[in-house]
Amino acid sequence: MEHKLEDIIAIFNQCFEEEYNTRLVKGGDEPIYIPENDEVPYNAIYFARGFYSSALHEIAHWLVAGKERRKLEDFGYWYEPDGRSEERQRDFEKVEVKPQALEWILATAAGFRYFASTDNLNGNPGDTQPFKQAVYEQVKTYAEKGLPKRAETLRHALAQFYGAEDRIDLAKFDVTRI
């Protein structure tokens, strides 16, 4: 199955451009979220380097962000660049569990392979298995309790577009493969 950038952009924008004044945009080397301002009259989620996986990841951060955070550049999150110590890596992973669980759910709805990202290629990521397990546990929680409204809207749209099953089937989530 081919995953075109034009498709994920169109699907996202159809779901959210009108109600949330938010667009998904192919960006450059680094992803960033920029709220509407004097120069750009809409909120923009810029994903990196034309990667479908980056689009899903940045969308997931937008889906987690509440109304007030969506008014801030990059949702007001701290970001420590690649090369983090193992301790700082654990802090980073704590804020990544929910977005990555949503990313995995969206990827599965689109028939796209998800890989957990610790985003620390030049540092010491340590044992990543606890992080992957935490992401899986969050997927289970979402499957049992339901997704937030915006996440469910997009999950449903992706499943319809890609002809996937229109539910979160935990049998399709294998923590050993991420």
Pin down the residues of each PLM region.
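Short pre-active-site segment immediately N-terminal to the catalytic Zn-binding motif
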Residues: 1-4, 38-54, 89
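A metal-dependent hydrolase signature that marks the N-terminal structural subdomain at the beginning
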Residues: 1-22, 155-174
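Catalytic zinc-binding patch centered on the HExxH motif and its immediate surroundings
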Residues: 14, 19-42, 123-126
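Active-site recognition of the HExxH zinc-binding catalytic motif
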Residues: 53-67
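Post-HEXXH active-site segment of zinc metalloproteases
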Residues: 64-97, 115-125
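An active-site-proximal "capping" alpha-helix that borders the catalytic cofactor pocket
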Residues: 93-108
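Substrate-binding/catalytic groove segments of enzymes
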Residues: 106-118
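Pan-zinc metallopeptidase signature
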Residues: 118-178
